[in-house]
Amino acid sequence: MHCPFCSATDTKVIDSRLVADGHQVRRRRECVQCHERYTTFEGAELVMPRVVKQDGSRQPFDEEKLRGGMLRAVEKRPVSMDQIEQSLTKIKSTLRATGEREVKSEMIGNLMMDQLVNLDKVAYIRFASVYRAFEDVSEFGEAIANLQK
């Protein structure tokens, strides 16, 4: 790695530590030439599959879209940001684990509902009502009845 201060190509690692629950490595480095120290973070570059929408169009996976949907569902509910981030991480891990280059948006929606049902039942019903396009009260009743099983 080039030194950010003098652009020398020779640097040495002084200290390495795992951070972000072991998903990243933090390294303290020192330039052999100018002796400046700096920190780098190293993590695996994990490629997410493309999303195939219901109309057949394809688009890149958008984590912010997923986060936004979950935040809307849990709005004003007793769910912490840590719980939300853990759920998003589980969804992303499941998508990567498929090994597929493309996944259907329906799969992502179902994974989201699986996470929400464990986080907060009201948030699950909110999300399901939009995702499954509930038309009347009876569909809400069916979804609630399924939760009580």
From Swiss-Prot:
Instruction: Kindly give the Pfam families that the UniProt entry links to this protein.
Output: ATP-cone (PF03477), Zn_ribbon_NrdR (PF22811)
Question: Where does the signal sequence lie?
Answer: none
SS bond list: none
Tell me the keywords, alphabetical order.
Answer: ATP-binding, DNA-binding, Metal-binding, Nucleotide-binding, Repressor, Transcription, Transcription regulation, Zinc, Zinc-finger
UniProt keyword Signal, yes or no: no
What InterPro entries does the record tag this protein with? ATP-cone_dom, NrdR-like_N, RNR_NrdR-like
Q: Describe cofactor binding as the record notes it.
A: Binds 1 zinc ion.
Q: Does the keyword Protease apply?
A: no
Instruction: Identify the residues that the record assigns to the ATP-cone domain, covering every copy.
Output: 49-139
A GO term, aspect molecular function: ATP binding
Give the record's GO biological process terms: negative regulation of DNA-templated transcription
Where do the ZnF regions (unnamed) fall? Answer: 3-34
Which cofactors does this protein require? Zn(2+)
Please give the HAMAP family that the UniProt record associates with this protein: NrdR
* Function description: Negatively regulates transcription of bacterial ribonucleotide reductase nrd genes and operons by binding to NrdR-boxes.
- What family does this belong to? Belongs to the NrdR family.
For this entry, the protein name equals Transcriptional repressor NrdR
Q: Which source organism?
A: Shewanella piezotolerans (strain WP3 / JCM 13877)
Taxonomic classification, please?
A: Bacteria, Pseudomonadati, Pseudomonadota, Gammaproteobacteria, Alteromonadales
